[in-house]
Amino acid sequence: MKLIQLYGDRGLTIVKGEAQYVWDIEGRRYLDFHTGIGVAFLGHRNPIILEYLKNQLENISILSTSFSTPIKDEMLQALDKVKPDKMDNAMLLNSGTEAVEAALKTARKITGRKKIIAFKNAFHGRTAGSLSVTWNKKYREPFEPLVGPVEFLTFNNIEDLSKIDNETAAVIVEPIQGESGVIPANIEFMKALKEKTENTGSLLIFDEIQTGFGRTGKLWAYKHYNIVPDILTAGKAIGGGFPVSVVFLPDHIANKLEEGDHGSTYGGNPMAMAAVTAACKVIEKENVVEQANQKGQQFSNILVKNLADLKVVREVRGKGLMIGIDIRFQPGQVLKYLQEKGILAVKAGSTVIRFLPSYLITYENMEEASNVLREGLLKIENKAVSS
């Protein structure tokens, strides 16, 4: 029996994780800036999350949301402290792509419109609806026709927003485009986008699967822009490593949803609720958001200073602990070098090395990663010159 390999094989067998580190089968420790593409933001085997999951597993692990359970009440109280502004309702699902699907369906029902606006270079998932609003033709074209009509506008281009009209059901946007290269939205662009959706009666969906729950140095990345979306999707970090996603909705939208409008066999299971409850408690108890903000600024400053003289480095960008190092060639060799030296990172776009560390990283971790990255870039640069 073989597992279908849908992601590139890194050639490592990982057997354990703890805080900001993982260990391979030979006992070697790695500094984890991959974190399951941003999932383990709260650290591997976080003790609070472990405790909640163990306790819930000993009681009941699966239950339809037709039934109530004590962990649901505790989760709702915990979520109430971290919820996006004006969003008092949550729908629990299992993955980021499912949350996007639910958000798109909700927008169509609420507005009675069909057209969806997304942005070039966006990534929202690989199921039919979310794939329809994902830009990369490599992912999308083999499976067309998909859900439509969808129109892609140019990210950070205010003039292009004129194409949002009274037939638009929703505009879906990542505050920082992650998969395409860690590209933050401009403040002016986001404010213009919010104004345009309000004027046309379109719903503004923020896909915060990767940016949300403290990763960018704000609890939610929309807070960088002083606007509030109509719908927000969260995932990855919000489960502390457990597969769960959340769609947050305000009352005026949630109250129009009816039984059967959406559903999920596993969505909102007691284990997922326990994970979300625990993750919310970690965020509050450990002052995670402020740590991500301070450490993110510190790490970016270290990288900028250490890489400033390298011609192969175009830019260091991002927010908080979502950092991209844009280089002048494909990053495969650099990622391999980092891994050989005990640091796991991930590619973004065609030329970006993406660092998505846990909030638990230390100054020493930052220095080590920056120095190893510099060594790797110099080694590859010198090799290219000599050849």
UniProtKB/Swiss-Prot annotation:
Self-association state and partner proteins as the record states: Homodimer.
Co-factor requirement: pyridoxal 5'-phosphate
Pathway in which this enzyme or protein is active: Amino-acid biosynthesis; L-lysine biosynthesis via AAA pathway; L-lysine from L-alpha-aminoadipate (Thermus route): step 4/5; Amino-acid biosynthesis; L-arginine biosynthesis
Cofactor binding note: Binds 1 pyridoxal phosphate per subunit.
Binding site for pyridoxal 5'-phosphate: 96-97, 123, 207-210, 265
Enzyme nomenclature, EC number: 2.6.1.118, 2.6.1.124
Primary subcellular site in the record, as a coarse category: cytoplasm
Sequence similarity: Belongs to the class-III pyridoxal-phosphate-dependent aminotransferase family. LysJ subfamily.
Function according to Swiss-Prot or TrEMBL: Involved in both the arginine and lysine biosynthetic pathways.
GO MF annotations, alphabetized: identical protein binding; pyridoxal phosphate binding; transaminase activity
Protein name as catalogued: [LysW]-aminoadipate semialdehyde/glutamate semialdehyde transaminase
Catalysed conversion reaction: [amino-group carrier protein]-C-terminal-gamma-(L-lysyl)-L-glutamate + 2-oxoglutarate = [amino-group carrier protein]-C-terminal-N-(1-carboxy-5-oxopentan-1-yl)-L-glutamine + L-glutamate; [amino-group carrier protein]-C-terminal-gamma-(L-ornithyl)-L-glutamate + 2-oxoglutarate = [amino-group carrier protein]-C-terminal-gamma-(L-glutamyl-5-semialdehyde)-L-glutamate + L-glutamate
N6-(pyridoxal phosphate)lysine PTM positions: 236
Gene Ontology biological process terms from the UniProt entry: arginine biosynthetic process via ornithine; L-arginine biosynthetic process; lysine biosynthetic process via aminoadipic acid
Species whose genome carries this gene: Sulfolobus acidocaldarius (strain ATCC 33909 / DSM 639 / JCM 8929 / NBRC 15157 / NCIMB 11770)
